[in-house]
Amino acid sequence: MDFNLTREQELVRQMVREFAENEVKPIAAEIDETERFPMENVKKMGQYGMMGIPFSKEYGGAGGDVLSYIIAVEELSKVCGTTGVILSAHTSLCASLINEHGTEEQKQKYLVPLAKGEKIGAYGLTEPNAGTDSGAQQTVAVLEGDHYVINGSKIFITNGGVADTFVIFAMTDRTKGTKGISAFIIEKGFKGFSIGKVEQKLGIRASSTTELVFEDMIVPVENMIGKEGKGFPIAMKTLDGGRIGIAAQALGIAEGAFNEARAYMKERKQFGRSLDKFQGLAWMMADMDVAIESARYLVYKAAYLKQAGLPYTVDAARAKLHAANVAMDVTTKAVQLFGGYGYTKDYPVERMMRDAKITEIYEGTSEVQKLVISGKIFR
């Protein structure tokens, strides 16, 4: 078993790490404070090929693998959880769905500009009364000639206010439950489509999280992904991949907080010696280190399995569950190690702790991941 990264994967890490340190980190606190979407950096990410890492060059991508993409999310999240999830939602949820389930025409029209970073992607599944219970969709699509008319809404949509291309789900047959759900590609300029409420959040404050509103929205029939009534399996498979992205975000946030705590402990002195010389505090860091490394192996394994075309649903659930737990634990301990300073905005660990919380919630709560894992244990 080879645990070494390939030369290409190491180069991706180096490139993204330099970008994160030079471009993302300097504005991370400011965009969090002002809730400003970092469009300038997202455009640069497109220019550097980050928005299409796992997609073939034929479709405008970088021709990399899933682990290279996961490493990119991890490195960005070390300094800014917001930027990490912008990339994750764009790649794992929107572009990857089109890449895996779209027609050749859909790939050429929508995947190519997404992979090149010319367009930003988003994914719309969650509704006011359909969170974990995705089958309780109320959004309805009715076929009328050469188009569908869609009415309804989606909430908590990452990249919602800035995306150009969305994949959404709607009921085409309300009598069939989940077997009546279909998937559609929509564009921000479609008639009847508008952005509703813009959410104000505890963490990842610079990401655009919004409501999507559909009022007699016209969607061409050729924009359906897959067959009518086959949207639910597509949604669930896509979330499996998305969970690896969120696990990578959680891993990166934990690593970022760990790095900040380590640096602080070396410079901060109490009772005539630096904090790293206090055994109790040093052992806290040892526990954090072990937790981070165990999360890394779960995340990387899930990415490897996805790339290899092997079953990865349970591994993605394990990775997300554990990495999210680690992110909350490590960031909380980092704040504690900083003492009173950790509770202020003078240091980034309070932001990292706020950013970490959402990793236990979106793309399947920690409780949902336990359902997936326990289902395998007892089947």
Curated annotation (Swiss-Prot):
SUPFAM superfamilies the record matches: Acyl-CoA dehydrogenase C-terminal domain-like (SSF47203), Acyl-CoA dehydrogenase NM domain-like (SSF56645)
Record's catalysed reaction(s): butanoyl-CoA + oxidized [electron-transfer flavoprotein] + H(+) = (2E)-butenoyl-CoA + reduced [electron-transfer flavoprotein]; a short-chain 2,3-saturated fatty acyl-CoA + oxidized [electron-transfer flavoprotein] + H(+) = a short-chain (2E)-enoyl-CoA + reduced [electron-transfer flavoprotein]
Needed co-factor(s): FAD
An annotated GO BP: butyrate metabolic process
Top EC group: oxidoreductase
Pathway: Lipid metabolism; butanoate metabolism
Any GO MF annotation of the entry: flavin adenine dinucleotide binding
InterPro entries for the chain: Acyl-CoA_DH_CS (IPR006089), Acyl-CoA_Oxase/DH_mid-dom (IPR006091), Acyl-CoA_Oxase/DH_mid-dom_sf (IPR046373), AcylCo_DH-like_C (IPR036250), AcylCo_DH/oxidase_C (IPR009075), AcylCoA_DH/ox_N (IPR013786), AcylCoA_DH/ox_N_sf (IPR037069), AcylCoA_DH/oxidase_NM_dom_sf (IPR009100)
Alphabetic keyword roster: FAD, Flavoprotein, Oxidoreductase
A Pfam family it matches: Acyl-CoA_dh_N
EC numbers, comma separated: 1.3.8.1
Top-level lineage group: Bacteria
UniProt similarity note: Belongs to the acyl-CoA dehydrogenase family.
PANTHER family hit by this protein: ACYL-COA DEHYDROGENASE (PTHR43884), ISOVALERYL-COA DEHYDROGENASE, MITOCHONDRIAL-RELATED (PTHR43884:SF12)
Protein name as annotated: Acyl-CoA dehydrogenase, short-chain specific
UniProt source species: Clostridium acetobutylicum (strain ATCC 824 / DSM 792 / JCM 1419 / IAM 19013 / LMG 5710 / NBRC 13948 / NRRL B-527 / VKM B-1787 / 2291 / W)
Gene from which this protein is expressed: bcd
